[in-house]
Amino acid sequence: DFKKDNKDENIDIIGQFGVGFYSAFMVADKVTVISKAYGSDEAWQWESSGADGYELEPAEKETAGTDIILHIKPDTETDNYDNFLDEYGIVAIVKKYSDYVRYPIQMEREKSRQKPEPDPKPDDYKPEWETYTELETLNSMVPIWKKQKSEVTDEEYANFYKDKFSDYADPARVIVSRTEGTANYNALLFVPSHRPYDFYTKDYEKGLALYASGVLIMEKCADLLPDYFSFVKGIVDSQDLSLNISREMLQKDNQLKLIHNALEKKIKNELHAMLANDREKYESFWKEFGRQLKFGAYSDYGMHAELLRDLLLFWSAK
C-alpha cells in the first residue's frame, strides 16, 4: 500500500523500494527487522528467508528505531560471505560504495591505546597497552564535489585526486561542474598532468565514477565521456539516476546523455581556458594527450573537428 500511495511522489530515500532492502538476501539467508515507533509502547519483529512470505510478531525493544539483523549465509566454493562479517571487509565495502551517503554509517571498532603512566613513574616502568571499543563513523558523508569550489583548497583537490585515482602527481586542471534543471548533477573532474602507462593501449578503460545520490553504481561509466576526452578522470553524482539501473538501461538513459553533452562542453571550455591563460601548462598537457585530440578531430569523418579545432596545436616555422 505504501508503494502504491507514493508511486508518484518524489521520495528522496535511497533504495526505499528495493535495492536497499532486498539486496540483503544476496548475502543473508534470513533477515530480521525489529522496529518500534517513537512514542509507542509496542515493538514488532518481521522475519523472512526471502522465499515464502514472512513472519510478524510482537517483540521487545527498549528504544524507538529499527534494527535490521542479517543472518549471513555460509561460505561456498565461489562466494566468501565471511567477508561481510570481517571488520576490515566491512570498512572497505562502506568506503567503496557508500562513503558519500549523507547519513553516518557507524560501527564499533576495537582499538588499542597506551595506559596512563603512573605518577611517580618507577625506574623499571614499561609501557602497558589496553584494548577498547569505540563507535566510529566509517563514511565521509559530505562529498568534496558538493562543496563550493571556494570552500576547497587546491591542495585538498590534489590530495583527493591522488588518493582516489592512485596518481603520484597533482592534476593539471580541476573542473567543478554542477547543474540543476533538465539534468541535475554534481561533477568533479580532473585533467591528469601525465598520461597513464597504458593510455594508448587496448587495456586502458575510460570512464567516470558514477554515483546516484552518493552511492556508487558504476566505477567507470564510459558513456559519460567522448573518446577524445578519455584521459579525464573524475566523479559524477546525480539524483536523477536510479540506484539499481543496469548498464543496458544506462546506455538508453536520456539523463546520462544530457550529462555527457554538458560535460563535453565544460571540458572543452576548461581546456581552451588553460590554453589561453596558461600556455606553458597547456603545452605540457599537449605533449601527453595532444595525439588523442588530433585523433578526435580526424575520426568519424571529421564530425568533431569544429568542437576541437580551438584546442589543437601545430608546429610552425614562425
Task: Report each predicted region and the residues it spans.
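GHKL (Bergerat-fold) ATPase N-terminal catalytic module, capturing the glycine-rich phosphate-binding loop
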Residues: 1-84, 92, 115, 316-317
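A short, contiguous, amphipathic alpha-helix enriched in charged residues
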Residues: 1-6, 150-172, 212, 307-317
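Conserved, well-folded catalytic cores of nucleic-acid-processing
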Residues: 2-5, 27-37, 71, 97-104, ...
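Short flexible coil/turn linkers enriched for glycine and charged/polar residues
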Residues: 7, 50, 61-64, 99-100, ...
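A short amphipathic beta-strand at an alpha->beta junction
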Residues: 101-113
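A contiguous, basic/glycine-rich beta-loop/short-helix subdomain that forms a polymer-engagement track
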Residues: 195, 206, 280, 284-318
